[in-house]
């Protein structure tokens, strides 16, 4: 049925000096399909933008194999993968760019009032921490909605502790744009709950940049343990209004005298000057409950006997700018022999832990370190047999974790199962000297200028310095989007860097094995003497590493030396060969790679003597990028349409699956792999079993970047009641005022077309159905108002396949419209009628 409504003005309405003899028509159009016909899909309503599938470099630091990285008590949600009405920024690797410092190199900006990011919980949560950025100098609130209801509490945000300028960096020297703010809901929300961060009219710190939100299910506050002395019993103020420094000192002294521990109840405590603690066990109610406001909690300026054990509280600082000339670090100095730190939260201090003067047989675990101005944790000499494990470290202004053998050696240090993301300067993990240290099963993501994922280095900074010696074990680490341009060198640093900066690797064996290097913007492994003195890098063994998606080469050697390499498999390598050019000797091939078995997907030839431009390997491409099958009758099958899948990369892409969803089927020629520079075809057909708009997805899963490659599929299943004319183009011989031809096909019976007053007959209205279709009947509608009295109209119906030559389908006849039956008339068309253009 092609539904067209013949309309006239209601009786009694006659414009002055005008005849009322106008042909009014076609408020809505419906075509009943007979046989195989095409139909019109109903337009979907406007909704908030949902982020599309992220680019290949958006691999999450949390989607890694079990046993790798920290086991963390939160679920992280990327803003770009949530629903949002703001602006997506990134991806980017440009120094000094907001997107570059974001997790996954993407974030969402709220640039106007009313814009939001909305997260849907996949597990229960009662608290969250949002990683955000504001313009420099800005502070303000951000509204929080749960299931559409605004909370009375707002997030209080500031840029005061962000934006560090490091003048020693060439180019853009400002970094650390982001900070963190956390909130407890006061109740637990279950999976499926929506949490929206929205810039309301009272939230004036625009633009808000939202990177990620970490949702926690925080356990209840702990109660005071036996044999402990509470700081409040010594006069500490849990409201944070009064200074509690003296009360803490007195509690520590009293606890030591009694052989008991120190208890910090829930509350906020102001500490105005650092504590000196020889030995103590200090316990809080939990890092979301016991909060200490200070930039420096403990400062032991010489070795202590220890142990100084710390657990279950937060140190929340307010450090503005980096302070290398002071000891303003959350935990500074010595904590002694055998100490344990467990379950702290440290934020907005200069450094999290700066451990020096003497620390041994110690453990730092289950701790969050965020938004420090310099290192997260640094063993600054005199540390032995200490383990740092299962910690989450984000947004440091320098190395995430570091071993620095100044003024004496660090030895037997283990960094294991930590997750380190977004160090905004320097490395995720660095071992500067020392002996027999281990770096295992960590995750490092998104390093910035001067930063590798992992650096094994003889850079001394100061003397006396103890170079690397013994065996340095680096195993099972996952490095994601690590390595960066070094603006001071003018060339990139690798995801992994072996750096004979101030002395050669001569008395050390470095075993690098297992794990993966994923999505590095530049090279995977770098061998360099960063001072430019050409010291050799020897004793390096690399084995069984998975490398995927590099901007340049697997190996970049800038000095002399020897490395043994086996079992390194690579795909998506941006540039063929290896950079191998010794400096300052300017000798091609100065570095020797002894290649064992199991290497694939890369080569040490050709030898490159100029730093290659990154050719970030492209994802597979699909042409066309979407398929539209139009209208297909329910129970029928469309003709096949073809998608060409091309591989622009430098290596073959293995194909794990080709699939379609919805009422679609496919056949393909892709086989088990697509050769470098090659292509395959996928033929798709549409076979609806019901009416309406029916979508699907063609998905090609491969080893290439951005897998799976997806192609959107759309079509409409047509049944006998399908409205073919809805939304289609309508034209008329004339129109009066706002009563235009498009009113015929808008689906609204209260709007209509009316011809120009006094225009001669015949007046026509024509609908273009988009293609030749089989049509069974035509329905005409007047507005249903009873003001439109019963009347009979005389009409004829014509059809055309080309819009030029029309033939009569139904001769002139009278059709009665009665308000009591909906003011509708139906015209049956001859069996077998086909037309693209239908004219009344």
Which positions does each model-derived feature cover?
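Disordered, acidic Ser/Thr/Pro-rich linker "stalks" and the adjacent N-terminal cap
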Residues: 36, 96-102, 617, 718-772, ...
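Extracellular beta-strand-rich solenoid/capping regions of secreted or surface-exposed proteins
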Residues: 249, 253-254, 269-283, 291-339, ...
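Extracytoplasmic
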Residues: 52-224
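Short glycine/acidic-rich loop motifs that flank beta-strands on beta-rich extracellular proteins
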Residues: 36-37, 260, 271-274, 286-287, ...
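Acidic Gly/Asp/Thr-rich repetitive segments characteristic of extracellular carbohydrate-active
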Residues: 231-265
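Feature for long, exposed domains in two main contexts
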Residues: 615-720
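Right-handed parallel beta-helix
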Residues: 285-288, 306-317, 337-348, 359-375, ...
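Juxtadomain low-complexity/linker regions and immediately adjacent membrane-anchoring helices
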Residues: 52-81, 219-230, 712, 716-746, ...
């Amino acid at each position: 049925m092609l539904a067209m409504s013949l309309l006239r003005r209601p009786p009694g309405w006659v414009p002055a000096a005008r005849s009322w003899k106008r042909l009014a028509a076609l408020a809505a159009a419906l075509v009943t399909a007979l046989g195989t016909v095409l139909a019109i899909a109903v337009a979907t309503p406007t909704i908030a933008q949902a982020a599309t599938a992220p680019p290949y470099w958006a691999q999450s630091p949390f989607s890694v194999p079990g046993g790798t990285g920290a086991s963390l008590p939160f679920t992280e949600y990327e803003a770009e993968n949530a629903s949002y009405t703001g602006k997506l920024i990134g991806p980017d690797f440009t120094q000094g760019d907001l997107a570059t410092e974001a997790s996954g190199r993407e974030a969402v900006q709220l640039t106007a009032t009313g814009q939001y990011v909305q997260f849907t919980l996949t597990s229960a949560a009662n608290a969250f921490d949002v990683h955000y950025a504001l313009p420099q100098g800005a502070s303000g609130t951000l509204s929080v909605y749960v299931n559409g209801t605004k909370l009375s509490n707002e997030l209080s945000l500031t840029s005061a502790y962000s934006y560090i300028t490091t003048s020693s960096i060439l180019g853009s020297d400002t970094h650390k744009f982001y900070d963190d703010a956390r909130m407890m809901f006061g109740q637990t929300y279950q999976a499926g709950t929506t949490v929206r961060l929205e810039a309301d009219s009272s939230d004036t710190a625009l633009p808000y940049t939202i990177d990620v939100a970490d949702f926690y299910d925080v356990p209840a506050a702990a109660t005071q343990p036996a044999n402990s002395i509470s700081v409040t019993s010594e006069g500490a103020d849990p409201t944070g209004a009064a200074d509690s420094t003296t009360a803490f000192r007195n509690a520590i002294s009293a606890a030591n005298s009694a052989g008991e521990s120190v208890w910090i109840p829930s509350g906020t405590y102001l500490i105005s000057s650092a504590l000196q603690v020889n030995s103590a066990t200090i316990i809080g109610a939990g890092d979301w409950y016991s909060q200490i406001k200070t930039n420096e909690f403990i400062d032991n300026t010489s070795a202590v006997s220890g142990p100084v054990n710390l657990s279950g509280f937060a140190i929340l600082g307010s450090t503005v700018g980096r302070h290398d000339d002071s000891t303003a670090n959350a935990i500074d100095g010595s904590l002694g022999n055998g100490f344990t730190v467990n379950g702290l939260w440290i934020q907005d201090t200069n450094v999290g832990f700066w451990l020096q003067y003497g620390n041994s047989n110690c453990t730092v675990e289950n701790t969050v370190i965020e938004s420090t101005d310099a290192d997260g944790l640094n063993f600054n000499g005199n540390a032995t047999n200490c383990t740092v494990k299962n910690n989450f470290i984000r947004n440091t202004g320098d190395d995430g974790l570091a071993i620095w053998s100044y003024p004496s050696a660090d030895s037997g240090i283990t960094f294991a199962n930590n997750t380190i993301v977004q160090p905004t300067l320097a490395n995720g993990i660095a071992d500067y000297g020392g002996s027999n240290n281990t770096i295992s099963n960590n995750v490092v993501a998104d390093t910035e200028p001067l930063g590798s994922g992992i650096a094994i280095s003889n850079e001394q900074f100061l003397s006396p310095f103890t170079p690397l010696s013994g065996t340095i074990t680096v195993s099972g680490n996952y490095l994601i989007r690590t390595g960066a341009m070094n603006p001071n060198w003018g060339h990139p640093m690798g995801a992994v860097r072996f750096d004979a900066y101030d002395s050669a690797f001569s008395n050390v064996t470095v075993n690098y094995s297992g794990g993966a290097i994923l999505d590095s913007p530049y090279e995977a492994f770098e061998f360099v003497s960063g001072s430019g003195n050409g010291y050799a890098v020897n004793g390096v063994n690399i084995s069984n590493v998975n490398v995927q998606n590099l901007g340049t080469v697997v190996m970049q050697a800038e000095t002399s030396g020897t490395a043994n390499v086996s079992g390194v498999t690579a795909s998506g390598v941006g540039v063929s060969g290896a950079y191998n050019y010794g400096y300052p000797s300017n000798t091609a091939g100065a570095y020797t790679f002894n290649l064992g078995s199991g290497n694939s997907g890369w080569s040490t030839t050709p030898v490159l003597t100029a730093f290659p431009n990154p050719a970030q390997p492209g994802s597979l491409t699909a042409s066309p990028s979407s398929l539209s099958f139009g209208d297909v009758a329910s129970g029928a099958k469309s003709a096949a349409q073809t998608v060409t899948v091309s591989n622009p990369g430098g290596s073959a892409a293995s194909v794990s699956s080709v699939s379609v969803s919805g009422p679609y089927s496919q056949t393909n020629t892709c086989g088990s792999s697509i050769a470098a520079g090659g292509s395959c075809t996928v033929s798709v057909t549409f076979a609806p079993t019901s009416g309406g708009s029916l979508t699907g997805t063609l998905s090609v899963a491969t080893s290439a970047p951005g897998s799976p490659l997806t192609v959107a599929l759309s079509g409409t299943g047509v049944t006998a009641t399908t409205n073919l004319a809805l939304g289609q183009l309508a034209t008329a011989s004339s129109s009066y005022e706002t009563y235009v031809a498009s009113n015929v096909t808008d689906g609204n019976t209260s709007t209509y077309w009316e011809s120009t007053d006094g225009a001669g007959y015949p007046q026509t209205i024509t609908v273009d159905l988009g293609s030749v279709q089989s049509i069974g009947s035509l329905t005409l509608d007047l507005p249903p108002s009873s003001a439109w009295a019963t009347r009979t109209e005389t009409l004829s119906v014509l059809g055309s396949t080309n819009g030029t030559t029309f033939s009569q389908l139904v001769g002139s006849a009278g059709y009665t419209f009665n308000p009591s039956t909906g003011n509708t008339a139906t015209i049956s068309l001859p069996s077998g009628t086909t037309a693209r253009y239908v004219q009344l």
